[in-house]
Amino acid sequence: MDMPTVSDVIRTADPQQWRPGDAWMAGGTVLFSYGSDTLARLLDITAAGWESLTVSEDGLEIAATCTIAELFAFPDAAPAAAREQWPALGLIPLCCDSFVASFKVWNVSTVGGNICTGLPAGPMTSLTTALDGVALVHSPDGTSRRLPVTELVIGDGRTALAPGELLRSVTLPASALRARTAFRRLSLTNLGRSGVLVIGRLDEDGTFVLTVTAATKRPVQLRFAAVPTRAELRAELDRSIDAALWHDDVHGLPEWRHYMTDRLAEEIRAELAAPAPPAASAPAPPAASASANTPAPKEGSL
């Protein structure tokens, strides 16, 4: 960590205290690892007292300060009714595991921080976009606004947050949590950052939703009134993701990400088109191994 210009750390969750040169801080795992030579103050929201996870008839509200460890433990600790009625909770451990980080990081890193970093491979972005998460954002002028997480993360390291705005929470609607889901993820290395992460959802009304993250610079979500055919899905992927949108870094070339997204999307389509297995609520884990030439799913990290 190198922050030679920081002169003060203030415990506050009031956006009206923000001024140019400030940065909001929760767990600080990314902020401290990157460092800064421009920030003047850090506004620490960890003492805000927000309930980490709130269950209601509307769904699950996740506070921005909720740690990855708290979220990971939730499916087992949730009220019985939520465990029975929300099979999509099975996505939570899969997305948390996509960090492949130590327990020290899990106990400090926060859901809100991971989303606000705006990294293509951010697993909390993957989770919340796949389940139609809606962000609550507080502004320095005292107003608040809500927007889908799919519209909050807009590029590699870029979000739609205006200067001084603070992410308060993300709510996952009950309708999405009741859905049947499927999960696929790829990395070029055994413990590497996600290169492709695709999540499918089949809602109670038959709507099919496919969300692509990690492979693209921002989340891409496709919706169909029913499970599409293979050709329909492929055509919509090609229409929705142009060449410039595929992410390109050391964790995967755009061509590889494109090919594997098509492949994993078809696996998900076929899985959700088939009858649901009896009493199976959690999404299927990725299948076997991967390499750059003949890739198949493997564990990775952020």
Region annotations inferred by a language model:
Residues 1-302:
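C-terminal structural segment of proteins
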